[in-house]
């Protein structure tokens, strides 16, 4: 048995690297399992969803070990595991899923029915998602390993592209899911709300799917400049020029075929004054306004049932002032919920290995040490155009 260290949430605005228990072959209720593996973590990423917790915008308990974006090397195998072996390099979908229940069999692994006693769906290191220990650590347990893990073939080639492959655990499939559920295809005009890592992953996915034009909107000028550098059109939502007018200036018409919400419940308003304050319904309402009749809206951005820091009493319980009548009148289709990573990760792995997508450059991957994780959280919260990837064992240098 080895020691272990991980990134621990200690209350709003505070995370710390601490000694934590080495993983055991047990579920969160303490029951012995034979279907799991223990990984030496090769990479684990800081996600915008983690930031929601760290900002105190969820009911996450102090002491929670963070991290749901994990790539690792198998170092221990449960007695019931059949397809994994010691030394395998694997990508871990952020969804914890059993593979046996109805929703798993229907590829809805984001809402597995058995891994979380409180509700459908499980994830590592996340509030209300089953108590599975997070992977921003040196070692982590992965249950139902035969079902959940994506083996990365050819370890040497994979390590050469590890900065890209680390995005397979969440943000690339999540962005892709947003684009797919928004109906993106060859020739589509697409608007992406949010120039953070998920928004850029959605934009890159739209391009991969054949979109003619991809517009990324945000209130953060630094992130918009990065998006522009990656070849996307941009809409500056901190300006008083309405979004539909900015789109019309680019396309010659004020609406798009497809739209993606990559922001979620901590959205800000639009315009010089509006962008200075939260307005959680802004993105959804704006997307209904600029999506054409019979268009589709993909919503991978996170919305919660409880938000202690919400701007009003209704939003504290996930109730937002949505112009649903507009969406109904325009016959919009909406798709929400946790991304079923397994539905896409194998194909996206192939796209990375064959240089069809350079996701690390697009989302601004910056590799940091485990000890630098608190600093990474601080910089990410300040809005830098980066995706922080933690390298707990300094393996990237050897790659």
From Swiss-Prot:
Q: Which UniProt keywords apply?
A: Metal-binding, NAD, Oxidoreductase, Zinc
Q: Which InterPro entries match?
A: ADH-like_C (IPR013149), ADH-like_N (IPR013154), ADH_Zn_CS (IPR002328), GroES-like_sf (IPR011032), HCHO_DH_non_GSH (IPR014184), NAD(P)-bd_dom_sf (IPR036291)
- Known EC number: 1.2.1.46
Residues annotated as binding Zn(2+) 1 are 47, 68, 170
Give residues annotated as binding Zn(2+) 2.
98, 101, 104, 112
Q: What does the record give under GO molecular function?
A: acetaldehyde dehydrogenase (NAD+) activity; formaldehyde dehydrogenase (NAD+) activity; zinc ion binding
State the superkingdom.
Bacteria
The primary gene name is fdhA
Required co-factor(s) are: Zn(2+)
List positions binding NAD(+): 48-49, 52, 198, 218, 223, 263, 268, 270, 300, 302, 337, 339
Q: Which organism is it from?
A: Pseudomonas aeruginosa (strain ATCC 15692 / DSM 22644 / CIP 104116 / JCM 14847 / LMG 12228 / 1C / PRS 101 / PAO1)
Q: How does it assemble?
A: Homotetramer.
One Pfam family it belongs to: ADH_N
Cofactor comment: Binds 2 Zn(2+) ions per subunit.
Q: What is this protein called?
A: Glutathione-independent formaldehyde dehydrogenase
Q: Which reaction does it catalyse?
A: formaldehyde + NAD(+) + H2O = formate + NADH + 2 H(+); acetaldehyde + NAD(+) + H2O = acetate + NADH + 2 H(+)
SUPFAM superfamilies xrefs: GroES-like, NAD(P)-binding Rossmann-fold domains
Q: State the function annotated in the UniProt record.
A: Dehydrogenase that catalyzes the NAD(+)-dependent oxidation of formaldehyde and acetaldehyde.
| Similarity section | Belongs to the zinc-containing alcohol dehydrogenase family.
């Amino acid at each position: 048995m080895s020691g272990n260290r991980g990134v621990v949430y200690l209350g709003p605005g505070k995370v710390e690297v601490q000694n934590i228990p080495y993983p055991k072959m047990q579920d969160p209720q303490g029951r012995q399992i034979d279907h799991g593996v223990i990984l030496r973590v090769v990479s684990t990423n800081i996600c915008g969803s983690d930031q929601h917790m760290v900002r105190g915008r969820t009911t996450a308990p102090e002491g929670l070990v963070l991290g749901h974006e994990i790539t690792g090397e198998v170092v221990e195998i449960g007695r019931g595991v059949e397809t994994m072996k010691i030394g395998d390099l694997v990508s871990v979908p952020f969804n914890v899923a059993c593979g046996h229940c109805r929703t798993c069999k229907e590829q809805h692994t984001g809402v597995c029915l058995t891994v979380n006693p409180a509700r459908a769906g499980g994830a590592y290191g996340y509030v209300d998602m089953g108590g599975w220990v997070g992977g921003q650590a040196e070692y982590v347990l992965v249950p139902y390993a035969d079902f959940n893990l994506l083996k990365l073939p050819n370890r040497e080639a994979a390590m050469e592209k590890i900065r890209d492959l680390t995005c397979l655990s969440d943000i690339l499939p999540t962005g892709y899911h947003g684009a797919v559920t928004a109906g993106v295809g060859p020739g589509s005009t697409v608007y992406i709300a949010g120039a953070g890592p998920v928004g850029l992953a959605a934009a890159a996915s739209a391009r991969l799917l054949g979109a003619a034009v991809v517009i990324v909107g945000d209130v953060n000028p630094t992130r918009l400049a990065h998006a522009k550098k990656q070849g996307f059109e941009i809409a500056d939502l901190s300006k008083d020029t309405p979004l539909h007018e900015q789109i019309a200036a680019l396309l010659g018409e004020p609406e798009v075929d497809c739209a993606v919400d990559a922001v979620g419940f901590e959205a800000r308003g639009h315009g010089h004054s509006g962008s200075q304050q939260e307005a959680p319904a802004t993105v959804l309402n704006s997307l209904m306004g600029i999506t054409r009749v019979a268009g589709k809206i993909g919503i991978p951005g996170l919305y919660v049932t409880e938000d202690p820091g919400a701007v009003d009493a209704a939003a504290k319980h996930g109730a937002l002032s949505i112009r649903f009548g507009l969406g109904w009148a325009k016959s919009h289709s909406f798709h929400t919920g946790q991304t079923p990573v397994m539905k896409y990760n194998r194909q996206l792995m192939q796209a990375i290995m064959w240089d069809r997508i350079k996701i690390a450059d697009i989302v601004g991957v910056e590799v940091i040490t485990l000890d630098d994780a608190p600093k990474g959280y601080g910089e990410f919260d300040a809005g830098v155009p980066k995706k922080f990837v933690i390298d707990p064992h300094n393996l990237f240098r050897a790659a």
